[in-house]
């Protein structure tokens, strides 16, 4: 968990903002949302496979766009 030390004469709202930024960088919120409900191992595999397919299709699309430009 990220920790933020409040500096001397630093307003609390700025320290809170730094803490929020540190949490966002560490991925705390996304991890909490991901673990909010139990996900079956088959669903995890299915979700990861779908994400991999999506990444692959996106990569192919980017490569075809690069090769078709002839100007």
From Swiss-Prot:
Keyword Ribosomal protein: yes
Keyword Ribosomal protein: yes
A Gene Ontology term for the protein's cellular component: ribosome
Entries under Pfam families matching the protein: Ribosomal_S21
GO molecular function, one term: structural constituent of ribosome
The entry's keywords: Ribonucleoprotein, Ribosomal protein
GO biological process, one term: translation
Organism superkingdom: Bacteria
NCBIfam families: S21p
Similarity section: Belongs to the bacterial ribosomal protein bS21 family.
Protein name from the UniProt record: Small ribosomal subunit protein bS21
Species this protein is from: Psychrobacter arcticus (strain DSM 17307 / VKM B-2377 / 273-4)
Gene this protein is translated from: rpsU
């Amino acid at each position: 968990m990220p920790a933020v030390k409040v500096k001397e004469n630093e307003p609390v709202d700025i320290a809170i903002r730094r803490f929020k930024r540190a949490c966002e960088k560490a991925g705390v919120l996304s991890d909490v949302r991901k673990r909010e409900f139990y996900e079956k191992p088959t669903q995890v595999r299915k979700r990861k496979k779908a994400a991999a397919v999506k990444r692959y299709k996106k990569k192919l699309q980017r490569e075809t766009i690069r090769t078709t430009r002839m100007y």
